[in-house]
Amino acid sequence: MLKTESSGERTTLRSASPHRNAYRTEFQALKSTFDKPKSDGEQKTKEGEGSQQSRGRKYGSNVNRIKNLFMQMGMEPNENAAVIAKTRGKGGHSSPQRRMKPKEFLEKTDGSVVKLESSVSERISRFDTMYDGPSYSKFTETRKMFERSVHESGQNNRYSPKKEKAGGSEPQDEWGGSKSNRGSTDSLDSLSSRTEAVSPTVSQLSAVFENTDSPSAIISEKAENNEYSVTGHYPLNLPSVTVTNLDTFGHLKDSNSWPPSNKRGVDTEDAHKSNATPVPEVASKSTSLASIPGEEIQQSKEPEDSTSNQQTPDSIDKDGPEEPCAESKAMPKSEIPSPQSQLLEDAEANLVGREAAKQQRKELAGGDFTSPDASASSCGKEVPEDSNNFDGSHVYMHSDYNVYRVRSRYNSDWGETGTEQDEEEDSDENSYYQPDMEYSEIVGLPEEEEIPANRKIKFSSAPIKVFNTYSNEDYDRRNDEVDPVAASAEYELEKRVEKLELFPVELEKDEDGLGISIIGMGVGADAGLEKLGIFVKTVTEGGAAQRDGRIQVNDQIVEVDGISLVGVTQNFAATVLRNTKGNVRFVIGREKPGQVSEVAQLISQTLEQERRQRELLEQHYAQYDADDDETGEYATDEEEDEVGPVLPGSDMAIEVFELPENEDMFSPSELDTSKLSHKFKELQIKHAVTEAEIQKLKTKLQAAENEKVRWELEKTQLQQNIEENKERMLKLESYWIEAQTLCHTVNEHLKETQSQYQALEKKYNKAKKLIKDFQQKELDFIKRQEAERKKIEDLEKAHLVEVQGLQVRIRDLEAEVFRLLKQNGTQVNNNNNIFERRTSLGEVSKGDTMENLDGKQTSCQDGLSQDLNEAVPETERLDSKALKTRAQLSVKNRRQRPSRTRLYDSVSSTDGEDSLERKNFTFNDDFSPSSTSSADLSGLGAEPKTPGLSQSLALSSDESLDMIDDEILDDGQSPKHSQCQNRAVQEWSVQQVSHWLMSLNLEQYVSEFSAQNITGEQLLQLDGNKLKALGMTASQDRAVVKKKLKEMKMSLEKARKAQEKMEKQREKLRRKEQEQMQRKSKKTEKMTSTTAEGAGEQ
């Protein structure tokens, strides 16, 4: 079995084309040649030739040549001749309706027999000169064989000059002919659907040759296509009838059991019978596989047979000169057998004699079995040759690229990768395959109780046969050794592609096609082996490829629209190119600069050969010079079959019948009457084709003349229409210019109007916004005014209630004082009570609440009625630190010595606080007021810090009472200080101005202001000089007064403006009310007048 590469070893250029399966089968056939180089290998080669390949490819003699080439690297020269002779003697099935000739003679296109220039023995001798050793390049050897076979191209069994021109350097199918030399009628057949409508004579021409060649093609193709190989890993289920048929050939293993060659059908009819009889038998009995149902196999075989029936007759004819059956039957007719042919047969007999001895030794261990069609295909050979053919043959079967291998009591030898057990079992050639013994039965489908009436199928309930399968693990797939085959075929092709410079090209396919013609280059062209690839042969002038400029002659076409063209047949490549549409994507490979391109040399030789053939055609068909052009290449050689307007009748007809290259081949000595009549018939058909085409061209010319006259009339009519349209266009253009100017002016007016409108809109929006703001402010002001009015009224009411309450309390306090004086009667107690009352009143004047005042009053009453010891807590409560802190904050660290005239400030000043503090100290030192004398108090008051206190203590009780009353009145006005400020400043009195100064902590200037009788109106007129005159020397005090005066002036101004606005609004409201009243009065007057008039009328 062939060793395969791992996926990691494959390059990105390895195509996933289905051809790999075909290559794999070919490699297996070649590998068996290496494993059994003598007998087994050669017989497997025989079977490999007949196996059906994918896409219509079949093994040809080139496969044998390549295998022989590989074998010669490790053989002796004397072995080379024998092997080549042996391989030369093998071929496909014969064509019964063709005249058979010896190997020295070759049938020409016209049916004449021409002697080969170089005989078979000469070719055999050429291989003796080949180099030995595996280091020599097999490609170089095949290249030399190809170059030598180019000179033998005139000895083809059937060819056309045009075809030879297109593929002269293609791989040679046989020893004397190339692959491109077949397929003339194939081209016509493929084009028959198109040519029927255009030129009926071409169809008739195609039918003539189909009638001549198709019977042999069908019979031979069926004979070849029914020969299969089973080479996979899955079991093959053959019916017992087939096994019996196979067993009947067991006696053929013995060379003595073969009948003599003269009994095997010498003439053509017997060969036809012997060939045709076993074919349907094998086709119907040997194709059931266990993994595939019988109906599927039959369906897969029928397309193969149908396709094989449609194969070109030329593809079969190429094997004709080398088929052994054809040779043995043609020998009686050829009266001049050459000595080279005799040498070939002797060499074959010697080789077969040695291999027959080997076979007899192998028969002890058993051998392979053979197919009936293989025995039928071996007709006409010598007895040892035929027995050798059956020595190591296999039965092969192909179905959709799936390969199966028959496993029985023996295994075929699959080369170095096989196991030792397989090699031992391969020697068992007498054992027969009995597949019925390798399956087990299981219970089938159960019987159905209710079968639907509409069912058209029936299920079998018979037991199900289960065949044993063998997994891939049974085979050794290690790649420990690399044999020579691993470096051939597809691997070599893709390796060659890797060395090319690849680039993508996209062409747009037009009505004339892609503008390129292709050619397949290589040695094994028919089987795909050692094929160089598909190359660009010519580039059509003016075509899509020439306009693009990237595709050049000798470039290799690697891919077309994602389909790989590496290692495919030329027929397949032409089909792919023909089926492309629209934008076609190519991957082109080109030789890198500096490399010697063998393809370029081959293509140049092909073009040169075409040139010579074209000259030959011109000589023989001088009357058709006008029709002989390059537009009608075949579908198998180039892609220009896509050209729609090509006349296939003329060009194709000429290309179908092509004459040989050399003039000496047409010597009258070698031409008989039948050949001349055949040639005359060809010329008649060509003449008929040409006449039909000429007649068709005449009719086309007449139609063109009529069309020309019609076009002239239309031209004059169109010119008149053009003139009229020009005049109308001029008028319309003038109208259009006028309309354009009018639109211009209208646009200008519109722009001006729009600008004015925008300006007015802006002004309107601004005015609207101002009106809304003003209305909102007016509403806010009215609301604020109402709120202020309500607040002032509430404050006045609260002050009034408070004043009344204070007056009531004053009266109560006076009554209490008189009561206390009557009780105590001493001056000291009076003075103490006076001090207490003054401090309590001072607290009231500084914002104490009514509750604190009541508390002080009750504490004073309790202190007078209780014992002296209980009076101490009262003095502690009077000497609170909160009072001291409040006094300090009110003064704000700006304490000044009071003047003696300021008697009013003696109690509220800091000195008064100090005196109170000393009095508290005296109380804390437990000095009782009763023991304190008036002299002590006077001495205490005589201290320099308390001048005001000493004066106040010296006063009489009546004077102190009057002072208390004055202080109560003054302090009662102090809560109303803010209320005084709220009044109009111009209305302030001198006392209110004094209070204002006291609120600013400027008590020292109160006496000057009161002395000068400064009222509110005068206060607003004061400036810096006047303030200095009033004794305000401190600049800070002046700045405070100026600031306050400025604020008052600003507030007065605002109030004045607000008053004016309010008066205006009131005036407006009054006017509105008056207007409404007037309107109402008018309405009432009208109503009264109307009622009066109505009453008067009544």
UniProtKB/Swiss-Prot annotation:
Domain named PDZ: residues: 504-592
Locate the transmembrane regions by residue number: none
Q: Which UniProt keywords apply?
A: Actin-binding, Coiled coil, Cytoplasm, Cytoskeleton, Developmental protein, Differentiation, Neurogenesis, Phosphoprotein, Synapse, Synaptosome
Q: Where is the composition biased (Basic and acidic residues)?
A: 1-12, 33-49, 264-273, 355-365, 839-849, 1051-1078
From the UniProt entry, list the residue stretches annotated as the region Interaction with TGN38: 597-1090
Role summary? Binds to actin filaments (F-actin) and shows cross-linking activity. Binds along the sides of the F-actin. May be involved in neurite formation. Inhibits protein phosphatase 1-alpha activity.
Q: What does the entry note on its domains?
A: Interacts with p70-S6K via its PDZ domain. The PP1 binding region is natively unstructured, upon PP1 binding, it acquires structure, blocks a substrate-binding site, and restricts PP1 phosphatase specificity to a subset of substrates.
Q: What is this protein called?
A: Neurabin-1
Q: Which organism is it from?
A: Homo sapiens
